[in-house]
UniProtKB/Swiss-Prot annotation:
Main location: cytoplasm
Protein name: Cell division control protein 16
Rab-GAP TBC domain location: 41-223
Source organism per UniProt: Schizosaccharomyces pombe (strain 972 / ATCC 24843)
Phylogenetic classification of the source organism: Eukaryota, Fungi, Dikarya, Ascomycota, Taphrinomycotina
PANTHER family: MITOTIC CHECK POINT PROTEIN BUB2, TBC1 DOMAIN FAMILY MEMBER GTPASE-ACTIVATING PROTEIN
InterPro entries per the UniProt record, alphabetical: Rab-GAP-TBC_dom, Rab-GAP_TBC_sf
Protein origin, superkingdom: Eukaryota
Any one GO biological process: negative regulation of mitotic cytokinesis
Membership in a protein family: Belongs to the BUB2 family.
Length: 299
C-alpha cells in the first residue's frame, strides 16, 4: 500500500458523526501498516493532520498562545534556556527549521498556562511538534494535549510516571527475555539507570528525528505506553552485542540509530507475550495514579 498522504486522509473523513470512531480505527490501522508520507528528513504535509486526529486536538486560534507568550519569561525561564541550548544537538535539520527562541517560547507558554514546573526532558518532547507542525501555535496545542491527556504523570516534578515506566520496563524485559534481563541485572543495570531519557522523551532523544516521528505516529495511534516496549525492541536489535559485552552500559549510554519499521514490528510481536495484568498496568502507568500504587508494590 502507498504511504498515508492527504488524499488518502481525505477519503477517510467520516460522512457522519456516527461513523467517526470507525474512521479513526481505520486510520490507526493504516498508521501501523503504512507510514505517513514524508521526505528523508521527516518533513510531511500530512503528519499534522494525522496527529490532530489521533491526539483529538482540533484546530484552535492562536489568541490563547499569543496571550501566554506576551507574558514573557516564566519563573522557569532560566532552566528552560539551559536545556533549550542543548536540545537535539546532532539534528542539524531540526536546528535549520526550529529556532531556540521558538522552543523557549513554547515551553515558557506551557508553564504560564498550566502553572506547572518545567521538567528536564520537556524540551525534547516539544521539539518534534515544532519540527512537524504547521505553526508554533499548533505545536503548542499538540504538546499541551500530549502532556495533559496522555502522560501527565511523566511531567510531575519527581517524574513519577517515568520511574514507574522504568520499573515496568524491567518487569516486561524479565518476562520477554529473561536471559538479557538477568545479564543486565548482574551488571547492576536496571531501566532507571539506562532508559529514563528514552522513556521520558518517547524515544525522541535517539537519532534520527525522522524515524522518531514515525514512531510517534504509531504511539499516538495505539498509546504512548507502547514506548516502553519500543525501548525494549531497540534493545533487542542489538541484544547479542549487549550480552557479549563485559560492560553493556557502554552500549546503553547511546542507543543505535532508530529504525522505526523494525522497532514497530518487534513491538507489535511483544504485546501478545505479556500477561494481561502486566499489560494493563503498562497501559495505565503514564496517566493513572491508581495504577501507580499497584506498580509501586511490584517486586
Amino acid at each position: 500500500m502507498p504511504s498515508i498522504d492527504c488524499k488518502r486522509l481525505q477519503k477517510l473523513a467520516p460522512k457522519s458523526p456516527e461513523n467517526q470512531s470507525k474512521c479513526i480505527s481505520r486510520l490507526r490501522y493504516m498508521v501501523m501498516l503504512d507510514q505517513v508520507e514524508s521526505d528523508e528528513g521527516g518533513n510531511s504535509s500530512t503528519r499534522p493532520y494525522v496527529w490532530a486526529v489521533l491526539l483529538n486536538a482540533p484546530p484552535r486560534n492562536a489568541d490563547e498562545y499569543i496571550r501566554y507568550v506576551r507574558q514573557g519569561p516564566s519563573p522557569m525561564a532560566q532552566k528552560i534556556q539551559n536545556d533549550v541550548s542543548r536540545t537535539l544537538v546532532v539534528e542539524s535539520q531540526f536546528h535549520s527549521r526550529v529556532s531556540q527562541s521558538s522552543l523557549s517560547r513554547l515551553l515558557n507558554a506551557y508553564v504560564w498556562k498550566r502553572g506547572a514546573l518545567y521538567v528536564q526532558g520537556m524540551n525534547v518532547l516539544a521539539s518534534p511538534f515544532l519540527y512537524a507542525c504547521k505553526s508554533e501555535n499548533q505545536a503548542f496545542q499538540f504538546f499541551d494535549r500530549l502532556l495533559q491527556n496522555e502522560c501527565p504523570l511523566y511531567v510531575l516534578p519527581n517524574i513519577d510516571g517515568v520511574h514507574r515506566g522504568a520499573k515496568l520496563l524491567d518487569k516486561c524485559l524479565e518476562v520477554l527475555d529473561h536471559r538479557l534481563y538477568t545479564y543486565l541485572l548482574s551488571k547492576g543495570l536496571t531501566a532507571k539507570i539506562y532508559a529514563l531519557p528514552s522513556i521520558l522523551t518517547l524515544s525522541a532523544c535517539t537519532a534520527p528525528l525522522s524515524e522518531a516521528l514515525t514512531i510517534w505516529d504509531f504511539l499516538f495511534a495505539y498509546g504512548i505506553h507502547l514506548n516502553i516496549l519500543c525501548v525494549i525492541a531497540q534493545m533487542f536489535i542489538f541484544r547479542e552485542q549487549l550480552i557479549d559485552h563485559p560492560s553493556p552500559m557502554t552500549l546503553l549510554r547511546t542507543f543505535p540509530p532508530l529504525n522505526a519499521k523494525n522497532i514497530m514490528k518487534i513491538t507489535i510481536l511483544l504485546i501478545s507475550k505479556l500477561p494481561p495484568e502486566l499489560y494493563n498496568l503498562l497501559a495505565r502507568h503514564a496517566w493513572d495514579s491508581e495504577a501507580g500504587v499497584l506498580i509501586d508494590r511490584l517486586t
